[in-house]
């Protein structure tokens, strides 16, 4: 752990010029420092952490605990320059939290400062909590990850002609390869009645766009399906289920779903990239992004995932089930793989890492774990443009322990390249666009590598721009009005196309998009099934 001189760098009290804007280091962290100093002073007789253990041997050279002051300065500078509003950080090493601190405003208008116990919207870091909840059901034989999700769905089923819906297994639903397309929609307080239940969402958007298992497409609908599955097999609403099966037994007392209205005032407000407050909103897929949690709680969730059996935490999963959460399901070209709820990969030296990012209007979050090094980093922010700061903080922290650290990209998809027309794509195609209340005729004409048009219904042909290849898929952007209640209501008319060959057809989706991703936006998926035009 290093000598006492090194460990004194944990005294991160704010300098005199920053004391008014930055809280002192928490009592929790001070206790950790004293405990670590005592452990070092008696020659390591005490265990590294009374909070847990990790059974995996280290395979990389991990440096002694670093001086976190440079990272603090990076965060304080971002806040003082108006590039951040509120930030919370936690670092785990050797089975304990070695640093946790809050900076700036959780709610500037209410005068609420950030602490390590401030609940932030996690956005997509919610997904591992959802997957963990499903895994507890699998461990009790209430469901099987390798069975079709439809086996556990009651009111609404996964449907579609672009492959076999039974290929959309529980595991694939949580690993972004179920064939369901991506989706996002936010609802402010005045639109709360428009937010669909998981069953209603599946009824409107639960159609596969691609053959299950054939390609990666990051998807929130799959996690809505997982929520519906969990509720159906238990008879309990999903927010309550996550609380009962994960949050409470793991001692994550700062954590709650957005549906817990009474607790929302304790959470961090959300701000756009200019620092303006964003009105409260919910989303169409709560199980994919509506959990609130503090940096302290996320750090303890990381301890659970790294098999540090924390004192006071219930054993909700045996180690083999935890390992199942982290097992690669779909490996992308870069070597990054999806798991059931996570992404994973390896450094050049072979050191494995597990990670998840979160991002939506007013939210940027990051969690990286290196289990073999018993090392993890959590950064939570409440700004739309917080991704760069999250990455910068986490990268600097992890590199101070493992110099070879390089941040991976959270995708298992191929990199885009210029589109080159092939016989599989070239020519005229006709078919249908379906989802929500829409069922429209569609015509596509791919004339060359840089010329294509799309026709929706009886509307004029629209040019497709930005034509690219993503592995075997064709992508491009067009415009048009889709005759569905959601597209009309939101004014979503920018159309993002993705198509791939399948059994002589082209199958895929159009995403109808609108809005500003920094404030409020929408991505609505409509499934395409196209055959060669006969005339």
Give, region by region, the residue ranges found by the protein language model:
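Short, surface-exposed loop or secondary-structure junction motifs
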Residues: 96, 103-107, 161-361, 365-366
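C-terminal segment of N-terminal export signals and the immediately downstream linker at the start
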Residues: 27, 48-81
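Central antiparallel beta-sheet cores of small beta-barrel/beta-sandwich binding domains
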Residues: 430-496, 522
């Amino acid at each position: 752990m290093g000598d006492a001189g090194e460990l004194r760098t944990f005294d991160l009290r704010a300098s005199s010029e920053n004391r008014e804007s930055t809280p002192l280091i928490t009592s929790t962290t001070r206790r950790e420092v004293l405990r670590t100093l005592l452990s070092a002073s008696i020659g390591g007789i005490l265990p590294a952490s009374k909070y847990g253990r990790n059974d995996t041997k280290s395979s990389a050279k991990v440096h002694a605990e670093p001086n976190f002051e440079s990272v603090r300065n990076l965060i304080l500078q971002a806040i003082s320059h108006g590039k951040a509003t509120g930030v919370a950080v936690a670092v785990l090493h050797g089975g304990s939290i070695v640093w946790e601190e809050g900076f700036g405003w959780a709610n500037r208008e209410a005068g609420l400062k950030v602490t390590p116990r401030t609940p932030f919207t996690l956005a997509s870091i919610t997904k591992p909590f959802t997957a963990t909840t499903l895994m507890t059901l699998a461990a009790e034989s209430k469901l099987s990850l390798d069975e079709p999700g439809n086996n556990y769905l009651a009111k609404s089923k996964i449907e579609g002609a672009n492959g076999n819906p039974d290929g959309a297994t529980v595991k694939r639903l949580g690993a972004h390869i179920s064939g369901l397309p991506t989706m996002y929609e936010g609802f402010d307080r005045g639109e709360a009645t428009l937010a669909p239940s998981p069953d209603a969402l599946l009824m409107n958007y639960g159609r596969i766009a691609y053959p299950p298992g054939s390609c990666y497409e990051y998807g929130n609908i799959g996690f809505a399906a997982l929520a519906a599955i969990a509720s159906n097999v238990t008879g309990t609403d999903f927010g309550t289920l996550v609380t009962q099966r994960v949050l409470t037994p793991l001692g994550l007392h700062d954590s709650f779903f957005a549906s817990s209205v009474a607790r929302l005032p304790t959470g961090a407000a959300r701000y756009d990239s200019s620092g303006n407050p964003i009105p409260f909103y919910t989303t169409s897929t709560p199980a994919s992004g509506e959990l609130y949690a503090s940096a302290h709680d996320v750090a303890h969730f990381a301890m659970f995932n790294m098999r540090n059996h924390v004192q006071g935490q219930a054993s909700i999963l045996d180690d083999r089930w935890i390992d199942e959460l982290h097992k690669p399901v779909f490996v992308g070209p870069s070597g990054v793989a999806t798991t059931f709820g996570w992404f994973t990969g390896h450094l050049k030296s072979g050191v494995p890492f597990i990670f998840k990012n979160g991002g939506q209007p007013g939210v940027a979050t990051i969690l990286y774990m290196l289990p073999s090094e018993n090392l993890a980093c959590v950064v939570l922010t409440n700004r739309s443009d917080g991704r760069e700061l999250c990455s910068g903080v986490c990268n600097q922290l992890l590199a101070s322990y493992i110099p070879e650290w390089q941040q991976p990209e959270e995708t298992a998809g191929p990199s885009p390249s210029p589109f080159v027309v092939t016989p599989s794509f070239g020519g005229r195609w006709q078919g249908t666009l379906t989802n929500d209340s829409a069922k429209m005729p569609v015509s596509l004409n791919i004339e060359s590598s840089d010329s294509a048009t799309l026709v929706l219904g009886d509307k004029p042909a629209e040019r497709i721009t930005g034509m690219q290849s993503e592995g075997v898929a064709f992508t491009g952007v067009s415009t048009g009005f889709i005759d569905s209640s959601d597209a009309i209501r939101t004014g979503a008319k920018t159309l993002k196309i993705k198509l791939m060959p399948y059994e002589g057809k082209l199958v895929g989706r159009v995403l109808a998009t609108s809005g500003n991703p920094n404030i409020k936006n929408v991505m609505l998926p409509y499934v395409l099934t196209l055959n060669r035009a006969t005339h």
